């Protein structure tokens, strides 16, 4: 399959947890024989902090403006079997609507921030997604599973919401034979809204 991602950033993990998820995902898609292109908005804060300018498993192409994205990459998006638009993409509503209008294949939304996204939608903050756009995506991939998926379908009109959880990159993280020091461990991204629960 030809897969095109329009994501926040894959070239810089600076203040951006999305990069780690995308890097492992595209590498594994390529390993399975898929052709992957990642389209990334070239913004100064990531440009100044690129820790992986050429990620393994995909062709990474940068664009500076929405007009440049449309002019330079319409054929890639149109001809892709799957187009995946990620959460927090700059001008995400316009990018998502353009992808839905342009692509002939499936257009999916990959929400790496589902609780944040739902809170933003509830307060009318449409930074990268609107309720109407949820219904236009053929597939809604969410870091959150369970009843949230049904809510995305019933309340927001997603034709198909499925979990695609954050994953551990097995090339970087794997079991090792070391003595156990703890009975229980927790590894997660720090977030002010989750920390009180973790501290209990």
Pin down the residues of each PLM region:
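Nucleotide-activated donor-dependent transferases that construct or modify glycoconjugates
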Residues: 1-15
